[in-house]
Amino acid sequence: MESRKIEMERIQRLNEKDTVAGEYVLYWMQQSQRAQYNHALELAIEQANALGQPCVVAFGLMPDYPEANARHYAFMLEGLEETRDVLAERGIPWIARHGSPPRVALELGGRASLIVCDRGYLRHQVAWRQEVAREAPCRVVQVESDVVVPVETASDKAEYAARTLRPKLWRHLEAFLKDLPPTPLLRESLNLPLGGMDRAELRGAATRLQQGPDVAPVGSRFRGGARAAEDRLRELLQDKLSRYADHRNQPQTDDVSYMGMYLHFGQISPVYLALQVMGATHQPAKDRDAFLEELLVRRELAMNFVHYRPDYDSYACLPAWAQATLADHEDDPRSPLYTPQELESGQTHDIYWNAAMNEMKARGYMHNSMRMYWGKKILEWSRTPREAFQTALTLNNKYFLDGRDPSSYANVAWVFGLHDRPWKERPVYGKVRCMMASGLERKCDIRAYVRKVQELVQQAGR
């Protein structure tokens, strides 16, 4: 399927069925939860215009989404309400129904000429799209909009490290870093009788969703949605970016983008984000480059990882050398030793680690340099490396707003050697890289970070 404005490498046909004589073109929204810079949405509008039909957007609100809780649902619903309004301004109905995403897509897809979906990389997301492609009565087309360079275009295998993926990505950047202006819909479709939730039902949807563990929403500390993401981006471009390279490993500062949570829910486009940062030529080149390294190389390395390693959430995903060296040191004495429950309480002997855990619990976020230290100490203080892996992944997915994400799975696995190299052998860690409290004391004002978190926790409790 060709498009006038969307790169052909982003578009993938998922079944061998034809476009049929339906009533509308359906965009099944799941991963890319936005109305701007959304390649799947723009393709659906293009196709609707070509067929002389309306365009409809479907969304399934799943009551038991894998590992989701009240914190995740609240942030997502804030963004979805805004997306609904922006789509309405473009004459496009956003139809939300309770139910599994593929079932909702198939319900509305039964009257569609064509189904367009966005792309997700986790196992359940892949399985959902396969289900829709298999059961839909019409052609299903997937569009990749939550990476800059499509995963298979960047590489045809699981990459060893950032250094092996980086040159492959940079070769393709010019071809995929392109503006995506909105396509006007020729046939407005807001009055189609398709049901779905009204505004009041959407705002109350959280009460019907299974909220898993008791994890409170973060409230006003982080608001969901494209407008909030745009506000964060404006802060970055006008101020924080000028200190990004020097302060990205300084957890006591606030010179970070906070983009991870918005990228996770698809509330901002990585293409748009990259273009904005690259265009901020009033800011130092080293700071722009440091940010783009995280957004383009590290993030898309994580996408590569979960795409080519279906066991991304299993200890088996670790490189052979890491598994071997951790096995060699599995019986090393560990002191102190904490249970997963003791770690979750954030009451260890290490005040720096406790601060990181408490920040994570209070506001669903942790500075990236502290995420690394946090994970390394779980490895050091757990009964076995396998237990440590599961503890880190469980806490990560439970508390972080950007948990349950390809970057989260890659970050946890990095703690245990993924995308890294062997280091000097030492107890417990073997040849896996370690991190020490003395390193934090040497490289940053870690006690200022502890004080900052104490204030954040006090504010959260008010």
Over which residues does each language-model region extend?
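Short low-complexity stretches enriched in small and charged residues
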Residues: E9-T19, N69-A74, P217, R227-E230, ...
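Short acidic/polar alpha-helix capping motifs at helix-coil junctions
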Residues: E7-E9, I95, R221-G225, A320-W321
